[in-house]
Amino acid sequence: MRLLPLLRTVLWAAFLGSPLRGGSSLRHVVYWNSSNPRLLRGDAVVELGLNDYLDIVCPHYEGPGPPEGPETFALYMVDWPGYESCQAEGPRAYKRWVCSLPFGHVQFSEKIQRFTPFSLGFEFLPGETYYYISVPTPESSGQCLRLQVSVCCKERKSESAHPVGSPGESGTSGWRGGDTPSPLCLLLLLLLLILRLLRIL
C-alpha cells in the first residue's frame, strides 16, 4: 500500500495549487503596437487581480519592416494627467521598459503584486487603476499608445466602470473570492472527503 501516501500527496498538491486556494495566476497579453485601435484611442482597460501578470509584447517584424520604419517605444507608468496628455514627465512618470529591438521578439512582464522584493519593482493596491503610456523614440513611426490597468478588488460590490471584453479575451476568467469555485476544485474536495470517509487516506 505504498501508493496511498503518493495518492494523498498528489491530491493535496493539486488542491493547494488550484484556483480555490489562489494558487493560479492569470496572464493578460497585450501586443503593444499601433495596429491595436484600443491602445491608439486610449480606451483599452485590463482588469487584473493580485498575483496576475501583464505581458507586454513589443512590436517585432519579420524582414525589412514597414516602409515608414519600425515602431520603437519607451513605456512608462504615469498618473492620470500624464495618461490624458500622453506625456511622460514629472515625478509620477516611471520608465518601465524600452521596446527598441523591432527585429527580435521582446516581451516584458509586470507581476501585479502588493509587495515586491525588488528595488525597481512596483507595488499595486487593490481597487486602484494604473496608467501606462508609450512615447515613440525620435526615429520611430509609432504613435502614443495608452492602457489602463485596474487592480481588482477593493470592494466585492464595486464593478468595473469600463468593459474589459470577454473573459477569455480580457484574461480575467478564474475564481475571485465570493464566486463559485471551479468544478476541478469541487471534485478534488469531494474525492478527498470520500477517501477520508473510507479511511483509505
From Swiss-Prot:
Taxonomic path: Eukaryota, Metazoa, Chordata, Craniata, Vertebrata
GO cellular component: extracellular region; plasma membrane; side of membrane
Family annotation (InterPro entries): Cupredoxin, Ephrin, Ephrin-A_Ecto, Ephrin_CS, Ephrin_RBD
Summary of the function given for this chain in its UniProt record: Cell surface GPI-bound ligand for Eph receptors, a family of receptor tyrosine kinases which are crucial for migration, repulsion and adhesion during neuronal, vascular and epithelial development. Binds promiscuously Eph receptors residing on adjacent cells, leading to contact-dependent bidirectional signaling into neighboring cells. May play a role in the interaction between activated B-lymphocytes and dendritic cells in tonsils.
Ephrin RBD domain boundaries: 26-155
Superkingdom of origin: Eukaryota
Keyword set, alphabetical order: Cell membrane, Disulfide bond, Glycoprotein, GPI-anchor, Lipoprotein, Membrane, Secreted, Signal
Gene Ontology molecular function: ephrin receptor binding; transmembrane-ephrin receptor activity
Gene3D superfamilies: Cupredoxins - blue copper proteins
PANTHER family listed in its UniProt record: EPHRIN, EPHRIN-A4
GO biological process: axon guidance; cell-cell signaling; ephrin receptor signaling pathway
Residues excised as propeptide: 171-201
Tissue occurrence: Expressed in the adult spleen, lymph node, prostate, ovary, small intestine, and colon, and in fetal heart, lung, liver and kidney. Also detected in hematopoietic cell lines.
Residues that carry a glycan: N33
Organism: Homo sapiens
Stated name of the protein: Ephrin-A4
